[in-house]
């Protein structure tokens, strides 16, 4: 299956189980892999034959920056639901969400989740 990839999208949101996360917020890193049939676009060179990744980015940004969830698992699920609703050609989605600075003690690069859904 063909794929559209958005990697390293950075958004500021207020998601998390800790009160600090819900009041102060933090940066969320989002990676998306969208399974889409790109055959027509590869032949036509027409934007109408693909999923516009700029519109995908805006859709995800509105959700991450406009909503508030306790779990990033739920945020990832909401991203999948929204993208399936807004972009019918998407057949499957893989979304990874990472927090670089959650309020937990320890040394790490990031913590996060990865979720895969099919239509």
UniProtKB/Swiss-Prot annotation:
GO terms for cellular component: cytoplasm. Pathway: Cofactor biosynthesis; tetrahydrofolate biosynthesis; 2-amino-4-hydroxy-6-hydroxymethyl-7,8-dihydropteridine diphosphate from 7,8-dihydroneopterin triphosphate: step 3/4. Keywords: Folate biosynthesis, Lyase. It catalyses: 7,8-dihydroneopterin = 6-hydroxymethyl-7,8-dihydropterin + glycolaldehyde. GO terms for molecular function: dihydroneopterin aldolase activity. The active site is at 99 (proton donor/acceptor). Its EC number is 4.1.2.25. GO terms for biological process: folic acid biosynthetic process; tetrahydrofolate biosynthetic process. It comes from the Bacteria. Substrate binds at residues 21, 53, 72-73. It is an enzyme of class 4 (lyase). NCBIfam families: folB, folB_dom. Catalyzes the conversion of 7,8-dihydroneopterin to 6-hydroxymethyl-7,8-dihydropterin. PANTHER family: DIHYDRONEOPTERIN ALDOLASE 1-RELATED. Belongs to the DHNA family. This is Dihydroneopterin aldolase. It comes from Streptococcus pyogenes serotype M1.
């Amino acid at each position: 299956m063909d794929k559209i990839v958005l990697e390293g999208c950075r958004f500021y949101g207020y998601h998390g189980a800790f009160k600090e996360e819900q009041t102060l917020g933090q940066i969320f890193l989002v990676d998306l892999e969208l399974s889409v049939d790109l055959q027509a676009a590869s032949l036509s060179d027409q934007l109408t034959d693909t999923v516009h990744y700029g519109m995908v980015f805006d859709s995800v940004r509105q959700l991450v920056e406009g909503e508030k969830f306790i779990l990033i698992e739920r945020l990832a699920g909401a991203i999948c639901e929204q993208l399936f609703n807004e972009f019918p050609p998407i057949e499957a989605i893989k979304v990874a969400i990472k927090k670089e600075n959650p309020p937990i003690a320890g040394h790490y690069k990031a913590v996060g989740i990865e979720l895969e859904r099919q239509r």
